C-alpha cells in the first residue's frame, strides 16, 4: 500500500471531530434548510425558487414555462441539492390546499388533497402569481442584502423585501436538528390589520391583537374549536389548535339522514380519512353507516357523503366520527423562526414586530436608493440647464476643442461643471435645444426637487416613514385581501378551560378534624328554626368531626392557611364532590401538607390579582399581620410561606379585607379588642406580624373578623355548648392595637368557652357544625340580640359528648325557603331549592377533641323554653352588673 504524503494527513480526536461535524451539520440544517426567516417567512429553497422565477421574468402576464427549466435553473445557480426537493417545494407553493395564498401559478397536475403526487416536472408548467410580485417588489432598489451563491459565481438575496407578512399569512413547517417549526396560515386582511394596530400602538397586548387576528385561516377552511389553544399559541409560541371538518346532517327522504362533509381539516389526507371511516365501519366500531362515497369535484368542491341507517342517530354517529377519525384533529403550533440568523421561539406580537421592523428597513433603504437616484438626475439636469442658458458659448467651446477630453475640461473650467455634467452636455442631442425640450428639462428639474424634498422628509421623520409603510400595506390589503375561510366556533368543548366545563354553583367545602375534605352543593342544608336538631352533614371516623366549613363558588379560589403559617391554593371544583354522608378524601391528596401541618383557615377568593384587597392574620399568641392579597396570586403546588412566627405560636385565622376596616380579635375567655386596620402597616408575604392583643394567663385567640367603622353590623358569639348571641359592633369601642380588650360574654359551665366570633348584618343564615358532623342552618335574625356581658341563647341542641366545632354564614338571595313547620316535621334529607352566594367564612377553633356521640334529645321543648326565658332574664341582670364594672375592666388594657 502506497504511503500518503504526511502533509495531507491531519490527525484528529474522533470525539472532537464527531462533535464539530455534527454541530456544523445541525447549524447548516437549521439556518440553511429547515427554518423560515421571520422577515419573509421563507426557507432558502422557497426564496431561491421565487428569485429564480423573477430572474427568468416569469411574471403573471407572461406565458407559463416548463417546471423542469425552472428547477434546473434554480439548482444550477442557487440550490445545489436534488431536483426532487426543489420541485416538491415549488409544487407545494402552487397547491391552493397547502398555501392560503399560493405563490406559484401551476398548470398541469400539481397533486390533490387525496395525497396524489404531482406529475413529473417535464409535464407541468409554472409562473409567479400576482401576490408573489409583492414579495419581490423593490428587490432591485437595494432594499435587501445579497450574498454569494454556493460557488461564488452568482448573487442571491439573503431575504426578500416581502411587502406582506408571509410568515403568518402562509405559515411554515419544517424539521431541523433538535427543533421543528409549525406555523399555521392566517388571513391576509387580519394579519395586515394586526401590523397596522401594532404600528399605531407599540404597547398593544396580544389580547388586543386578537381583536384583529382572530386565529388561523386554513386554505381548506373547516372549523376551529375555541380560542383557548389559539390564545396560548399566540402568547407563548406553542399551543394546540383543534380543527374540525364542516359537516351537515341532511334529510334524504323516507326518514333517512346523511352526513355531508364539505370542508376538512388542514393537511388531512381526504382519501385516508375516508379509508379510516370505512375501517371503523368494517370493524363495527361505528354502527349505523350504510354507505360512504366521495363526491368531490371541481364544480362542487369537497363533498364526502355518509349515509346513515334509518334507525340510527346521525348526530351520535357524527360525534363518534369526530372522536375516532381525522374529521377532527389538532394543529400543533410551534412558532420557531430565524431571528438575526438564530432560531428563536416567538409569539404573535414578536412575529409582527420583526416584520414591521423589516418593512421599515426596506422602505428606508428604498427611499435612500430613490433619493440617491433623484439627486444624481437633478445634478445632471442642473448641468443641462446651465448649458441651455449658455448654449452659444457651449457650442463655441466644443467647436474650438480638438478632442472630447479637451472639450470636457474646457466646459468644466469655464462653466464650473462636474465631470458627469460635462459628459451629459457632450452627450446631449441637438433636438434638446428646442424650446419644448427646454421646458421639459425645467419641468423635470422642478418635479425632482419636490420629490427629493419628500424623500428627505421620509428619512428625517420616523412617523412619516411608518405612515408610508401603513399606506403600502393597506394598498396590498385592498388588492389581495379576502374573507376568512375558517370559522372559529366559540363555546365548543375545546374552547373551555377546566373551570368552564364545570357549572358555576354555590358549594360548601368542609374539612374534618382529621383532615378529610369534600364539597357539597350549598342547597344540601335546609333552613331550620333556632333550636332544631340539624341534619347529618357527614359521617365521621372515630374521634373525627367537621372542624371547618366555607361557602363559595366552584370557580372561586380557596386558600388554605395552615397552623405553620403556610398557604396552599385550590379551585373550588378541584375539591371532590361527594355525598353528604361521605367522610371526604384526605387533604394530603389535594395539597401537599407536611406531617404535622393542619389547616387553620380556609378562605374563598374570586380575584387573587386584586391590589385593593388585603389579608389579615391572627396567631394563637395574639400576633397580627396585614398583607396585600396580590402577594398570594402565584402559589405553587408545594405552597408558600404566608407568615413567620415563633415556635410556640401558630396561625389561628385569616380574613379578607378592603384595607379600611376595623379588626376584631376575640379570645376563648371572652375578651375582644377592636382597632383600626390602618394601624397595621402592610407587610410582605413572609414577614412576621405585630402584637394585636395582650392575652391574660391561660387565654388564647380563637377568632378574628373585620367590620366597617361606620357599619351597623353585630358581633356574633357562639360558644362550644351551642349558645350564641348578637351584640352591636358599636358597643365595642375603638382602642389601640395591643390592648387586653373588653368583655364580650359571660363564660359559665352552661355555655362553655368561645369557639367563634364573627360579624353579621342579621340578614344571613348561619351554619353551625358539631364534632359529630351534625350541621344546622339558622336565620341569624332569629338569634337574640344581647349586651356584651350576656351568655346568649341556645342555638342548637347537642347530644352527649357533642360540642360546636365550627360556624359559617351565608347570604340568602331567594326568600322561597321551606316552611318552618315542614322543616321541623321532615325526617328526610331533602333540601330546599335556595340559591346562595358566599359572603364570608368564619371557621371556628374547636377546643375539645372528644369522639363522636349519638344525637339524642336530652331536654323537652317546654323545659328548653323555660330555661331560655330564665337565661334571658339573668343575661339582662349580668349586663347591668357588667356595665358598672366596665370602666375598671377597660383600664386594664
Swiss-Prot record:
Protein name: DNA gyrase subunit A
Motif annotated as GyrA-box, chain positions: 528-534
Organism per entry: Staphylococcus epidermidis (strain ATCC 12228 / FDA PCI 1200)
Keyword entries, A-Z: ATP-binding, Cytoplasm, DNA-binding, Isomerase, Nucleotide-binding, Topoisomerase
Cross-referenced Gene3D superfamilies: 3.30.1360.40, DNA gyrase/topoisomerase IV, subunit A, C-terminal, Topoisomerase II, domain 5, Topoisomerase, domain 3
Gene Ontology biological process terms, A to Z: DNA topological change; DNA-templated DNA replication
Enzyme class: isomerase
The keyword DNA-binding appears for this protein: yes
Gene Ontology, cellular component aspect: chromosome; cytoplasm; DNA topoisomerase type II (double strand cut, ATP-hydrolyzing) complex
Residue ranges with Acidic residues bias: 812-821, 852-862, 880-893
GO molecular function: ATP binding; DNA binding; DNA negative supercoiling activity
Domain Topo IIA-type catalytic: start-end pairs: 35-501
Region described as Disordered: spans on this chain: 810-893
Reactions that this protein is recorded to catalyse: ATP-dependent breakage, passage and rejoining of double-stranded DNA
Residues of the active site: 123 (o-(5'-phospho-dna)-tyrosine intermediate)
Name of encoding gene: gyrA
